[in-house]
Regions:
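Non-catalytic helical/linker scaffolds that mediate oligomerization, partner binding
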Residues: 1-258
Length: 258
């Protein structure tokens, strides 16, 4: 790959190369990915995040590898380019959860469109009842500083208002100077935001099964009776997930299993 430097600066090692708008004909799972996946399977990881997911077929390839190894690891689809965004509905249906990987996504699409793209992905996750993770540049300034900016605090809160199930740090905790403080700030912002969140996510949810209706009904009963919590009896955890999809407010979901 030959490049001409137009605006010079410091280039770190092992940096990614982004080609916005270009459909790159490369395998979704590389030889190094296979090594990493094998390591994860042997160490019984709970989740495997697949980068630059373009469509359902990318996820099917990974699922076949996991099935062959009899691994129970769940797949997280990282949305990082326009092709993945265009196929977001089929990707949601074929994965356990979706990550809004804002770093590469902001380069591969448009930085000014990124807030709307994030909302679009979150809406799709809510519609299909899939877990959503917002990642990258949440508290970026805390790599060097002990407190976040006001804009960063608002950004984290906005992700939670949009229905994020998880907000994930990266550089802040991997190379930052204040990893513990980052986690504490993120936890505090999330807890306080959830108390004031009045959005009804259930309206967006596709009730595609009787089980999902039961989850929604459990939420309604708990809210109407001012319950202290919801108890879900489950073997796989899916019953608790069905209740969680409706995002009940103000009380926990307790899970009992054998």
């Amino acid at each position: 790959l030959l490049c001409r430097v137009l605006d010079g600066g410091k280039l770190g090692s092992k940096r990614h190369v982004n080609l916005p708008g270009v459909r790159v004909n490369m395998p979704s799972i590389t030889s190094q990915d296979l090594v990493d996946i094998d390591f994860g399977i042997k160490n019984k990881v709970d989740f495997i995040a697949l980068s630059f997911v373009r469509d359902k077929e990318d996820l099917d390839k990974l699922q076949k590898i996991l099935n062959k190894a009899k691994s129970k690891a769940k797949i997280i689809a990282k949305i990082e380019n326009q092709e993945g965004l265009d196929n977001i509905d089929e990707i949601c249906q074929s994965s356990w959860g979706v990550m809004v990987a804002r770093g590469d996504l902001g380069i591969e699409t448009s930085l000014t469109d990124l807030p709307n793209i994030q909302r679009r992905i979150m809406h799709a996750c809510g519609k299909w009842g899939k877990r959503s993770i917002v990642a990258t540049h949440l508290l970026e300034s805390m790599i060097e500083n002990p407190t976040p900016t006001r804009a960063e605090a608002s950004d984290v809160a906005n992700a939670i208002y949009e229905g994020a199930d998880a907000v994930m740090l990266s550089g802040e905790t991997s190379v930052g100077k204040y990893p513990t403080e980052c986690v504490k700030f993120l936890k505090s912002i999330a807890a306080k935001t959830e108390k004031f969140n009045t959005l009804d996510y259930e309206k967006n949810l596709i009730s595609s099964s009787d089980w999902q209706h039961i989850g929604i009904t459990a939420k309604h009963l708990a809210e109407q009776t001012n319950a202290d919590g919801i108890i879900a009896i489950t073997r796989t955890g899916e019953t608790a997930n069905l209740v969680s999809n409706a995002k009940p407010k103000g009380f926990p979901i307790y899970t009992f299993t054998n």
